[in-house]
């Protein structure tokens, strides 16, 4: 994987396992212990900003670490990125539920299956694009397996490892700012839906 390629350029194969551990543990901790307080204190929209901002910082530090071959800095960036996963991913994952609620509010029809299908499609599409992007960038930079890599290939790997995620996260923040307005209407929507349910009883 990309972490492995960076790690092998910095030290050895053992560092790959270390980095994976430093990524996994903070990610779990971020989801379990930081997501809830972040949602409660900031709300869904601002929690996304907090998580995305933390991940941008983490990826930027990892990018600088990869360029300077600084292992402690690489670990710090990995930990920051992992801890930021919870505040970012949890509110994003409830967007489908918000869409279902808002759809019911507008149409008086609750179509949960469509929301699930859209999320599933988006996940598969993003996975495919991510895999394709790795192949495209490695191909364009002249990557050759099991051989010493050129400076262009190394720069391409660092770009995928750090700077491309930063760009995508900035786009997420921009898109979320202009598209997601549900937070302003959520209380009204939920109150109306509850009112309709009570009227049926």
Regions found by a protein language model. Give the residues of each.
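Membrane-embedded alpha-helical bundles of multi-pass transporters/translocases
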Residues: 1-201
């Amino acid at each position: 994987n990309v972490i492995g390629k960076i790690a092998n350029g910095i030290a050895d194969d053992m560092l790959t396992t270390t980095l994976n551990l430093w990524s996994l543990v903070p990610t779990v901790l971020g989801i379990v212990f930081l997501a809830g307080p972040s949602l409660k204190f900031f709300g869904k929209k601002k929690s996304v900003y907090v998580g995305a901002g933390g991940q941008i910082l983490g990826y930027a530090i990892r990018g600088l670490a990869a360029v300077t071959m600084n292992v402690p800095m690489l670990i710090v960036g990995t930990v920051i990125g992992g801890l930021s996963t919870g505040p970012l991913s949890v509110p994003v994952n409830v967007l489908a539920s918000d869409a279902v609620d808002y759809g019911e509010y507008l149409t008086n029809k609750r179509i949960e299956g469509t929301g699930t299908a859209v999320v599933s499609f988006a996940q598969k599409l993003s996975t495919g694009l991510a895999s394709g992007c790795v192949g495209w960038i490695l191909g364009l930079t002249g990557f050759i397996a099991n051989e010493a890599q050129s400076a262009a290939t190394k720069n391409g790997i660092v770009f995928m490892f750090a700077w491309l995620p930063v760009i995508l996260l900035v786009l997420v923040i921009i898109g979320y700012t202009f598209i997601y307005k549900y937070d302003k209407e959520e209380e009204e929507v939920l109150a109306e839906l509850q009112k309709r349910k009570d009227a049926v009883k």
